[in-house]
């Protein structure tokens, strides 16, 4: 991307988005893990413009702090300016220009905050065309099979751009035109300022339309150019939730395809969803029904899925994660997780470790080679290397007031159904008997067993639950046991 360096970008994000039927501002609705506005600002920041401006209006008090956070993460300044009244896109651009230095004299790119697939390369091509043609304005256009709702591009007989007419103001014949305004422009700032001062609200919406600038500059004898793109999805806008879902699916298709081209096997792209900030290593296999969300990072040669959702999870090389729901966790190299495993935030599983069926973990570190095979809750615990936690074990971490930690050493073997009542420490190499309740520390190498000998209360069910199916079954079994077997020498 090479173009003239004196460039400012103005992103319009002041609209109310009433067709979304939502309390959330339109530009904050998300696709592939980012809000629409975040997609736009990430793309424009890649151009490294001198100035990046966002024009806000509706719900600006909710959007502005998020813009500040994004600016910090991108490591650049993003200026925010307000459009106090919804007077149209022309007025919004005028508000955006007010955030630029008074002596700025370069190119102004105008785009919208609700075109989430627009990329930096497309805008760079627009700027290159604009500079090469020495135009006052260059507009990005595309052709749609159904152009309803878009402004139509009017051209002269020699194919020069003459004007843009909005859907509501177009004549029946103009509405048949399929080349549309993509809502992305490159302007020379002096030409733009001059045309903005002459905009009129004499139209169906009684607003100041930015596209009317094209006709004004044309009448001034200025050069008006267009850059047509075939990939119309890049400039598709979102006005309702149907369009949000459609563009979300298209963006996901592109993300999945990019991973496939980079060496990832995706068995069923139609049921696989990958956020834009997720990363996947080579020769990893993604099974159907998998969602990789947020900043999830998958290593090389992993097996992920089926039916797995990972949000902000790091997975090391050669790991297997099957039918698992995890968030804000780390899975070590060559580890095995699943099926039906729930990793809550703060889980760290070491290299070669195992979390098996119906295991839930939270805020815990499980060491290298340690196995928690099934039916276990591990919360607020630190488990050393090469230990084994028996089936049905529970880390009892909550005393009704505070969460307490348990520390389990390396090479520990806990029997099935062990209860670790935190805070408690179990030393290296210790064992616990099945069903043991660990309330006190266990020294290294010790066997911990709780509870006395088993005591059977005879006939308790018949006495305490008479008439129940259990009591009847017990009565029959007792009767059969009390009947002597027949004498083989004297059959009945």
From Swiss-Prot:
Positions of the UniProt region annotated as N-acetyltransferase: 263-492
Compartments where located: Cytoplasm
Residues reported to bind UDP-N-acetyl-alpha-D-glucosamine: 12-15, 26, 83, 88-89, 151, 166, 181, 239, 344, 362, 377, 388
Record function comment: Catalyzes the last two sequential reactions in the de novo biosynthetic pathway for UDP-N-acetylglucosamine (UDP-GlcNAc). The C-terminal domain catalyzes the transfer of acetyl group from acetyl coenzyme A to glucosamine-1-phosphate (GlcN-1-P) to produce N-acetylglucosamine-1-phosphate (GlcNAc-1-P), which is converted into UDP-GlcNAc by the transfer of uridine 5-monophosphate (from uridine 5-triphosphate), a reaction catalyzed by the N-terminal domain.
Stored PANTHER family: BIFUNCTIONAL PROTEIN GLMU, NUCLEOTIDYL TRANSFERASE
NCBIfam families given in the database record: glmU, PRK14352.1
Name of the protein this chain belongs to: Bifunctional protein GlmU
Organism for this UniProt entry: Mycobacterium ulcerans (strain Agy99)
